[in-house]
Amino acid sequence: MRLGVGGAGLIIALRVPEGVSIHEFISDVVSSKRLKGGLIIGIGGLDYAEVGYYSPMTKEYIVTQLRASTTVLEVTSLIGNYFVKPDGSVSIHIHVNLATPDGVKGGHLIKGVAKPFLEVFLLEGGLDLASIFTHR
């Protein structure tokens, strides 16, 4: 078992503005604030999302593209984690539930664009998650 232990850390509140990629926005904040690793939680709305689930048979994600037409994709739950890899790049892993006119869709958030915005919290744990989540 690999175990990461961090202290009670910094909590950063973010407002991801309309038209902005969630992953890029979070990655920029993690890099600029020199964060190490922690949790992501959020709610809000999306204009566009690519949501997938992993197929162990093909070892690929089966992806569904969702786009808001007359409304938004309401983010009822967004949770994940982030960490900085040894090469300095930021790894972000997010799962999401989205309320749509056709029901709720959920899975791995591969891409998401905010509309009108997202309220996101980064809970920095100061963890070296790269040594734990070596598969990423």
Q: For each of these PLM feature ranges, what is it?
A:
Residues M1-L14:
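Generic N-terminal amphipathic, Lys/Arg-enriched alpha-helix
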Residues I12-A13, G37-I41, L73-E74, I94-H95, ...:
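Structural motif
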Residues E18, L98-T100, L122-G126:
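Short, structured patches in soluble enzyme cores that scaffold and shape functional sites
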Residues S21-S69:
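Short, well-structured hydrophobic secondary-structure segments
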Residues G38, G44, S77-N81, G106-K111:
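Glycine-centered structural positions embedded in regular secondary structure
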Residues V51-Y54, D87, L109:
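Short acidic, glycine/serine/threonine-rich loops at helix termini
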Residues I62-G106:
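Mid-chain, well-packed structural core segment of small domains
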Residues G107-R136:
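Flexible glycine-rich active-site/ligand-binding loops centered on an Asp-His dyad
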